[in-house]
Amino acid sequence: MQFSSYEDLRSRLLSHAVTCEAVARHYLDRIRSHEGDNIYITVFENEALQRARSLDLKLAGGGTPGRLFGMPMAIKDNISMKGAPLTCASKMLEGYTSVYDATAVLRLEAEDAIFLGKTNMDEFAMGSSNENSAFGPVPNPFDNQRVPGGSSGGSAAAVAAGLAMVALGSDTGGSVRQPAGFCDIVGLKPTYGRISRYGLVAFASSFDQIGVLALNCDDAALVLEVMAGVDGKDATSSAHPVPAYAAEMTDVSLKGLRIGVPEEFFNESLNPDVASVVRAKLEELRLQGAELVNLTLPQSDYAIAAYYILVTAEASSNLARFDGARYGYRSEAADDLSSMYVKSRTEGFGAEVKRRIMLGTYVLSAGYYDTYYKKAQQVRRLFQDRYREALKGVDVIAGPTSPFPPFGIGDKTADPLEMYLADVFTVPASIVGMPALSVPVGYDSLGLPVGIHLICNFFEEGKMLGIARHMQRPDSSRIPAPSNH
């Protein structure tokens, strides 16, 4: 059972060529066959089948199908679903069950989506390889000795391997886009505030956004349209009107389109194969009528440093609530209240989370606040001003999604700084708050996926998806990805 896109699935469902229950069973069977890959932390087998049957009855009874009728979806395990485990891939949330639904989940459910389960991730969304999970790493569907990227590695692998049609992830500095690039799928981070964060476990609140991972731009656009919009439960959500992204997307032409290409994104640290694939695709667009405009973004060298100061500072505050007293893991070795806090956090958090909490606490401490945190905030403002200025002269900024192709499991775990550089091209859009996405455009000499990263102005998701749609390959909806299992 294969579907070229959700539109294909929907037409078959509405014509009664296939049932929601049969579709759900197909995906659940595939999930079961990949059980050893750690892609899902929790599978909603009974709930998904029950939901599918109720949707079949709705259609048979003449009910109006929702915009996502029968779409099989996966949810990253830092997004709340009432009555379901919420682990954030951490020992700290061992045994915790969410008591409410995220706004994004409610909106998807209202349009008749089917939730298959919760996907693996880097612990508390901190990582670029999905190796920082208490449940173990997730292999890349293209090569099971390599990482799928992170922190939404489980969601990316689920879509790429045909274990979900679309998945939700969260993106703080590239956690949707980078794994999308590594797994040969589309990964979209919307404008900050475009999707409500209510129900998303906070990592860095001024950066976090729920994003979409899909096989193609059309499916990503539809899911974004359903989730987008103001929410009274999230004061940072935007009241900016939600357009029909699918319609906006198809109106985008390459003729006269100005594509900004920053020279800083093609420096000597960029893998030669990645550079070659990206430049070839940009040249292809030029031959189809687009104009390539050379840009200079000198602040790019400061992106990683500023980002890790700001997000670790926010993380140290956000994660203070996980103390062993209210919920989650509590150490049995504690003798008193003070040791309960210390031992619960020491035993409950993984190494990378503890590293970031300590970094954040340090940059917020007396004597260092002005030197680090305040300076990083000033750099953030410079980024915002420079990117606004750059996008006055071009329609989109384009470059590689990652400086290198998917790397081997264990290759970078001993060097945190090298791991952090995996997000060097995705972090700027997060610092600025602009929408960005990764679209697959080719393969390196080893057959590993390469993605192009696009950044557009605030709330220009429709235009960005339209540009990406011109880039995606005709076979972009294939299921599943190649695998050496």
UniProtKB/Swiss-Prot annotation:
Claim: Lipoprotein is one of the keywords in the record: no
Nucleotide-binding as UniProt keyword: yes
GO cellular component: glutamyl-tRNA(Gln) amidotransferase complex
A molecular function GO annotation: ATP binding
Catalytic-site annotation from UniProt: K76, S151, S175
EC nos: 6.3.5.7
Pfam families reported for this sequence: Amidase
Biological process according to GO: translation
Catalysis: reaction(s): L-glutamyl-tRNA(Gln) + L-glutamine + ATP + H2O = L-glutaminyl-tRNA(Gln) + L-glutamate + ADP + phosphate + H(+)
PROSITE patterns per the UniProt record, alphabetical: AMIDASES
Assigned keywords, A-Z: ATP-binding, Ligase, Nucleotide-binding, Protein biosynthesis
Family designation: Belongs to the amidase family. GatA subfamily.
Subunit details: Heterotrimer of A, B and C subunits.
Its biological purpose: Allows the formation of correctly charged Gln-tRNA(Gln) through the transamidation of misacylated Glu-tRNA(Gln) in organisms which lack glutaminyl-tRNA synthetase. The reaction takes place in the presence of glutamine and ATP through an activated gamma-phospho-Glu-tRNA(Gln).
Name the UniProt record assigns to this protein: Glutamyl-tRNA(Gln) amidotransferase subunit A
Species the sequence originates in: Chlorobium luteolum (strain DSM 273 / BCRC 81028 / 2530)
